[in-house]
Amino acid sequence: MGGVIPMKGYEAAYFTRGRNLVLSDTSDMCSPDWGDIYLAAKESWLLSEAGLTLYLSEGKREYLRKDCERLYLLAVNTEQKGTFLTAFDDKVSVFYFGEWLKCYFFRNGKNILDALEFSFAEYARIVSECEAFDEQLKSDCEKVGNGYYTIACASLRQSVAAHKLVETKDGKLLFLSKENNSNGCIGTADVSYPSIPLYLLYNPELVQGMLRGIYDFAKMPVWNFDFAPHDLGTYPWCSGQIYGTAQRDDKYCCGMYSTWASPRTNQMLYLRPAESEVYEKNMQMPVEECGNMLIMQAAAITAGADKSLAEENFSLLAGWVKYLEGFGLSPENQLCTDDFAGHLAGNVNLTVKALVGIEAFSLICRFLGKEELAGEYENKARTFADAFRVKVGPHILPLSYGGTDTFSIKYNILFDKLFGFSLIGQEVCEAETAYYIQKSNRFGVPLDTREDYTKADWILWAAALTDDKEKCEALYGPVVNYLAQTPSRVPFGDWYYSTRGDIVHFINRSVVGGCFAPLLKASGKCNVKR
């Protein structure tokens, strides 16, 4: 069903389902089967199949309504140049722990017709601003090196489009990602973390919008751990973390299993009491997520975001840094964000994340005027770094403690460098990146020694570690080749084989915002000493 709406100087044709079941299911690899689709121009039509055939064969535009025929939208302009608009109205964008939230544009009572009117009226200005942004981006990318602009173009819109921007009823901003093609979680902390270079560079308040949901869920009784959560549910339902739910086959856990690419509506796990024991501790990412939250919060404020969010959630941050103090130097057998590689004990990259997380907490304390505590944690970070050097020795940092002839991309060093602490040291950064170049394959350096697959976002984080432009280009150059030559013609896949160039999995994900790491470094926005 559908119709045509007369507007100011143009018309908008639309169609919709006979029954619009908003937010009726949720899963990865599933698109909404609700909402309205619009096509607008000077003249617009809703045509039956017979009407479309008449237009294509004779150029006649006539309203021909026939039941049980396919419907088509048609929009035409009679001049040589004109403007066409397409729009999708999802009615409701997100369920957020009991609140039904519309998209950000609709937050003050506006609707889809207001959006069309705004877009027509502001079209020239919007295009002009976009063109100016493109020119500036191209100029900035050329300073980074040859081919880098290609990666930026492939990353920017994909990363932004993998989020939904909404506002809670009390006016708090939420910028919620969908973990596309890797399980469909909403607001995943370790998906936000790799993406943040893009948002720190252009709008750090969006990083705060990523953090807010994790803070809110961490305060709920059902989350009874002393480390940070992984996610908020399955997009578009913030109904409680779905990752690592208990796999017991009993009457308390039935129906909690997360299934991939199977449309469903999740249970309201966020309502459950602490006694429910909903989550398996062994399937969480404790050091990973604590470090992520601390680093993201410190980076957001450093880049210019408001510090009140950190103030409101300081007790959580203080608890998470305590966890890193106790368990970060020698991580137990656990998962990290690269969970496809499985559990790993003594993960050196996780230890680096713990170190940077402790540094980040000292920064947060400094921003909040807690000078004594800031000094205390700066000293703790230095002590931690000294102990880390003793454990790893003077060689290339291994994949895990005791590992001989192993390596992994130590992307977690990045914010130690960007903040300006340099507790790891530039000598280590240069040695690591030189080694990565030696190990690089046709389409990039492998993520670690276990497999030949890699991650594009982490390669670009690594490229930002070196101050040598040629080395930076040598690291990201194979990613440019991958984008041009991969046989997997899909939206930018971030997890792929470094030798063959075909994807393993993971397409269309927000994490490619991390490809802006070299630009973020060049901006100096996260350097506290700037």
Give the ranges of each region predicted by the language model:
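Extended, well-ordered alpha-helical scaffold segments
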Residues: A115, I151, E205-F217, M285, ...
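Aromatic-lined, polymer-binding surfaces characteristic
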Residues: Y149, C153-A154, V160-T168, G187, ...
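Acidic/polar, glycine-enriched structural segments that form the non-catalytic walls/loops
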Residues: G2-G187, P204-Q208, Y215-V222
